[in-house]
Amino acid sequence: RTSGEVNVPVIWLFEQTLTVGAEWNRDELNDPSSTSLTVKDSNIAGIPGSAANRSSKNKSEISALYVEDNIEPMAGTNIIPGLRFDYLSESGSNFSPSLNLSQELGEYVKVKAGIARAFKAPNLYQTSEGYLLYSKGNGCPKDITSGGCYLVGNKNLDPEISINKEIGLEFTVDDYHASVTYFRNDYQNKIVAGDQIIGRSASGAYVLQWQNGGKALIEGIEASMAVPLMPDRLNWNTNATYMIASEQKDTGNPLSIIPKYTVNTFLDWTITSALSANVNWTLYGKQKPRTHAESRSEETKGLSGKALGAYSLVGANVNYDINKNLRLNVGISNIFDKQIYRSAEGANTYNEPGRAYYAGVTASF
């Protein structure tokens, strides 16, 4: 991966700063283990059934050029148009325009707004025709009522596209800071495990393929606050996110099971020039499960409506600079030993480990 950019001041009509940059990225996959599935069939939808005849390798390259112009037509006003061009070795060209606005409203308040088109390229497993994933049945789409199924790579996948919008207010007085931002991201071409049968293997298993699916939406509000309780000694910082929506448009299922709200608050204490301490508290809101069955297992066994209730975690750590090159760190996470165990019910999709102690040394040169 390599990148570079140059900033050029421009005096033409208004004060401007022009940014021009370029990026290049190459990803390579060589995973014999994940592509080693061998089946009795001679081929699966044109893909050799024998692992020896399928490549375990894949690669992709992305080359990009971008330009951004920070225009200040008057004091306190900034208009920032931008354009990014990406060329993907697998799927071709993509243009991503953007427009951001910042306007001061008096001495302490600023309003910001922006809109941008963005994309996400498929990963190498999703585009690798050598990668085969097999389910005996429970992981197959609900409309496949018997037998197993294969999920195969698709070299013709298009990138996921999103239109991202936000608008917010910032308030700053000396070292006090507060902000609130509304955001909405509309997605198209979401890459999903396909539910359309593209063929059957010689043994009768259904063949499916990664595909570009329907639309999705993420919408919410973010807020932050910074308060210097004792300037240069004790600072209190808080950020929070409230999710209005996070769903697949076609099913209403959440894109992922996440808290309705999350609050992080930190108390940073600079005790001496070498010694500092931090106490942190995180609150996770209620998490609701999926409501629409997508797999055979969910269809036959039914979906649990069990939600995961709100909970919080507390941690603390201490840092000590032994010298300018060496730092010591010790701490405790999840001080009150809150534990959650993953189960097959509803929103209980992950483990929350209990109390943990840690220590580390960082050397810098």
What name fits each language-model region?
Residues W24-N30, E61-S63, L83-S89, I115-A121, ...:
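Transmembrane beta-strands of outer-membrane beta-barrel pores
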Residues T2, K59-S63, S93-F95, I161-K165, ...:
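Residues that define the transmembrane beta-barrel architecture of outer-membrane proteins
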